[in-house]
């Protein structure tokens, strides 16, 4: 299966799916310093107890949420857990609030009657009342529509947060909810509307996109995840694609690499981020290596 976006709006769908999902084969023969494969990495530096960096997929698929034994062992041994954001009740409330407009605008007035009616029809079929849809930001409606119907389970990141709290581990965040939601709020109204239009047009292939990402993730194939992301941008507006990839992936990689330094200096940490952030020339594995850490693939 090879799903290839063909419109400017599709780059948003693919990149957002990759970013939000990120997002079991054997790789014993892959070179450890290539960073092309593997989800769990030991991070070491002289004089500090080693820590672990784990690539997640923001999915409730049973094959994703059940931690493999090496990952579970690293998690259990950690003195604290660091996620992209702390998923406590207040953060979840903030995320939910960020989906809605509070300036008096209504979705219909921003996107027009025809697109609004199509959005409401699909949302209603999924059990979401128009009263709620009417106050959504255009990007928020699109992101919700990207979630397959029935995909309402607890995703891996929430499992890690829940288990850390249950085990009495301190939980840290590399980013704030405001920073993550700001990635979408910063999109122009034109781009938000294009995203919503293209999401509605491509509802039938979003499931296929997610399936392809899931296969790459369960194969621990970081190189393939990068290829899927890069393929999504080939036929898209170059400036639009570059800007979105820079903001959603690259800039966040540098920010997270810097912010995890205090955790790594403490040692015995379990740090979990979307798997797409691990690989590539500007991925976290390469950035940590350049800072003098030794990275060893564990799983």
How should these model regions be labeled?
Residues 13-26:
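Bacterial N-terminal signal peptides
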Residues 33, 64, 249-253:
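A conditional alpha-helix N-cap/helix-loop micro-motif detector
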Residues 242-299:
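A cross-kingdom marker for long, charged
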Residues 35-39, 255-256:
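Alpha-helical scaffolding within the catalytic cores
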Residues 39-244, 248:
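Structured, acidic catalytic/metal-binding patches in enzyme active sites
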Residues 1-10:
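N-terminal secretory signal peptides that target proteins for export/translocation
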Residues 28-32:
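Boundary at the C-terminal end of the N-terminal hydrophobic targeting segment
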């Amino acid at each position: 299966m090879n799903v290839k976006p063909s419109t400017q709006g599709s780059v948003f769908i693919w990149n957002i799916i990759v970013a939000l999902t990120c997002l079991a084969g054997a790789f014993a023969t892959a070179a450890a310093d290539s960073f092309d494969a593997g989800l769990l990495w030991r991070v070491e530096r002289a004089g500090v107890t080693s820590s672990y960096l784990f690539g997640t997929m923001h999915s409730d698929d049973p094959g994703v949420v059940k931690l493999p034994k090496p990952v579970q062992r690293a998690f259990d041994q950690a003195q604290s857990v660091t996620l992209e954001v702390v998923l406590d009740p207040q953060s979840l409330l903030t995320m939910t609030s960020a989906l809605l407009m509070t300036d008096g605008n209504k979705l219909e007035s921003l996107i027009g009657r025809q697109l609004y009616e199509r959005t409401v029809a699909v949302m209603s079929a999924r059990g979401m009342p128009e009263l709620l849809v009417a106050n959504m930001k255009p990007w928020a409606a699109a992101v919700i529509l990207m979630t397959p119907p029935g995909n309402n389970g607890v995703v891996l990141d929430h499992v890690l947060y829940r288990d850390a709290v249950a085990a009495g581990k301190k939980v840290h965040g590399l980013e704030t909810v405001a920073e993550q939601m700001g990635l979408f709020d910063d999109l122009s109204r034109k781009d938000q509307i294009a995203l919503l239009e293209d999401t509605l047009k491509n509802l039938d292939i979003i499931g296929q996109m997610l399936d392809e990402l899931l296969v790459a993730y369960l194969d621990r194939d970081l190189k393939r995840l990068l290829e899927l992301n890069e393929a999504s941008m080939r036929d898209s507006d170059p400036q639009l694609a570059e800007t979105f990839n820079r903001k959603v992936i690259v800039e966040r990689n540098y920010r997270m690499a810097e912010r995890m330094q205090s955790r790594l200096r403490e040692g015995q940490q379990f740090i979990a981020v979307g798997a797409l952030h691990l690989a590539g020339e500007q991925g976290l594995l390469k950035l940590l290596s350049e800072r003098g850490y030794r990275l060893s693939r564990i799983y």
